[in-house]
Amino acid sequence: MSIQIFNSLSRQKETFVPLEEGKVKMYVCGPTVYNYIHIGNSRPVIVYDTVRRYFQYKGYDVKFVSNFTDVDDKIIKAANELGEEVHELTERFIAAYFEDVTALGCKKADVHPRVTEHMADIIQFIQVLIEKGYAYESAGDVYYRTRKFNGYGKLSHQSVDDLKIGARIEAGEKKDDALDFALWKAAKPGEIFWESPWGNGRPGWHIECSVMAREHLGDTIDIHAGGQDLTFPHHENEIAQSEAHNDKTFARYWMHNGYINIDNEKMSKSLGNFILVNDIRKQIDPQVLRFFMLSVHYRHPINFAKDLVEAASAGLERIRTAYNNVKHRLTTTVSLGDHSDEWLNKITEQKAQFEEAMDDDFNTANGISVLFELARIANIYLNETNTCKKVLETFIETFEVLGDVLGIEFAKEEELLDEEIEALLQERVEARKNRDFARSDEIRDHLQAQGIILEDTRQGTRWKRG
């Protein structure tokens, strides 16, 4: 089955057909780096990291670009409040961003372009729009002529006339029409600026992504993605800029993930329910956070609540336990039976079910349901009188491959503490005294599976980490 993507542009699922066979060009709007990212910011990072992983699983060569907005009103304000230089602030929070998303199991993009590295490209792009009549200069600012672009509103499914009703010109703005938006902003006293044909200033927010996407992926890209809140005006304005400049379709598929609520309320600083990833990942296993985020389809809203996160933690533990039990059986069983086509077919069927779920607009919720079923089947198999090496290995491989698509690690076991090892060894001594050799061997095998090497001597049992 081909991959089906819900395209925000058409508001329906479409079969994914890449611009270039076997390749995917994908752009995801990244953060404005003036603070740590909150859990709402983390959802698109996790979602589109998973989308990228699934494309790679299906054999596609993916070029994945995600930007940093490293100059912006919020950044300038934060730098002034903290008494830092803008570049110092942004460097600090870019480093913090990578720490957070790496903890969440996300891979780095192939390119993480920064606005400040593309000023010449941005200025040149704006000049072309002016030459084509799509933009105009006004007292040091440059604005986009929204009404000149015939397709404006096609992504957010709004008409220009409807948008006009709520639009207004703010004090100090020097634009011809309330719908026009800034491509270049004249510098205010004391602000960071770059030289341009229109005077000192810096770019508007929307122009940045149009330029960086074009520079790193070309005039037309396969997939442009981001949070639902970016649909309008940000992505709508990107389309207007890019298609006016390039005379080509900007992006063929638009993907938008849903919002995150906290205990059924919108997350906001005023409500005091603003959760930073940097804080929450110290309280909750980041893998549990990722598993939780993927337990709901990406287009649906998700409610972050303690009981739901705890349920996700218990669910992930069920799958990990099944995986580790299979792995333990493989390393400890001396006599293994002949392989069974019946069980191998059951595993293959689950893998096919997983692909069917992910092919259907990256339905990770259904994909996780498949992992639960795989764990259930594995537990049933482990109760068989004879188990087969081939089947056990196939279970392990399938857990690991499907887990990797979701960015979930099943193999990672917490290292036993010295005190836990000593307690198990004491229990083993008692078992041997009571001639409970089965329990003694079970403890030995469990420790060996965790890389603990035992040496029985006349003075007692010594141990070391392998």
Swiss-Prot record:
GO terms for biological process: cysteinyl-tRNA aminoacylation. ATP binds at residue 269. It catalyses: tRNA(Cys) + L-cysteine + ATP = L-cysteinyl-tRNA(Cys) + AMP + diphosphate. It comes from the Bacteria. Its main location: cytoplasm. CDD domains: CysRS_core. Belongs to the class-I aminoacyl-tRNA synthetase family. This is Cysteine--tRNA ligase. It comes from Lysinibacillus sphaericus (strain C3-41). The lineage of its organism: Bacteria, Bacillati, Bacillota, Bacilli, Bacillales. The gene is cysS.
